[in-house]
Amino acid sequence: LIYAQKGSGRRSGYYTDYTFAVKKEDQLVTIAKAYSGLTDKEIMEVSRFVTKNSLEKFGPVRTVKPELVFEIAFEGIGFSNRHKSGVALRFPRILRWRRDKKADEIDDIEEVKKLIR
């Protein structure tokens, strides 16, 4: 998780819209945005983390310390110029919060590209 934004409607008080990244050499590059998959309790935990760990803000978006790791499920994957990673996930959603993983254990973009057929 590298960016978060507050949701709308019932979720307007919480950070529920997330942007995720993968490693590309020595930097993090965006690969997907996801809005679903966490429980209400997890959303509250992530919101507290975002509030306490925001590094900068631009408009409604908060850049956060890259410490939380999530597993993302998706329907398809392909090359794209939309994300800095050069890859886009189709219909991404949060599968689970990987509390057992540290940020330096996230996938590298080269591993992700191997999924493209």
Task: Mark where each language-model region is.
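Classical nucleotidyltransferase
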Residues: 1-117
